[in-house]
Amino acid sequence: MMNNKNKFKNKEWKFSKKQVQLIYLTSSIISGLFLGLALLSTYLIAGLPNDNAFVLFVKEQKFYFPFFMTIGFINLIISMLTLLPTLKTLWRTVAKMHQYGDLSKEEFEALDILVEQIRNRYISVENIKAVISSNNYKTLDEELKKLEQQEKQLKIQEQEQKVKRLEQEIIKDDKTRVQSDY
């Protein structure tokens, strides 16, 4: 149960270019409308000429200040919240582009995937920087293969050590049994 929750927490949302543009367009339109409402409420508070029936109705009811200002600020907060995921994605993209330099889209995506693989394997930052600065993807593949071989060798060595320990324990147990029989 806990693992499933962590999987959803750690999931990163990635947007295509068209989705980002659509989100910016809709959020900017929504922000513009809501800011317009806030400005309209401020304008009504400052006082419009009384020749408009709507303005007269609002002024007679004496609820325009809290009503329009509340709507304006709530809508402003909502519009800011709609921008947050887009700004987060944009910030990550800009940070990664600054980190990797001037690469084509395919190189950028390939390097991003490879660096993510490296991070998942807990490789030191110095190795990542050295490989990225060389801009040689074959070197990166070779490093990954070497690390996989090292992991396999370490597992084999650990298993061999466990077997040796078990053999030594068995030999000790046999010696103690033989001595106890005498």
Curated annotation (Swiss-Prot):
Its taxonomic placement starts with: Bacteria, Bacillati, Mycoplasmatota, Mycoplasmoidales, Mycoplasmoidaceae
What subcellular compartments does it reside in?
Cell membrane
Q: How does it sit in the membrane?
A: Multi-pass membrane protein
| Transmembrane spans | 29-49, 63-83
Keywords carried by this UniProt record: Cell membrane, Membrane, Transmembrane, Transmembrane helix
One annotated Gene Ontology cellular component of this protein:
plasma membrane
Q: What is its main location?
A: membrane
* Protein name as annotated: Uncharacterized protein UU159
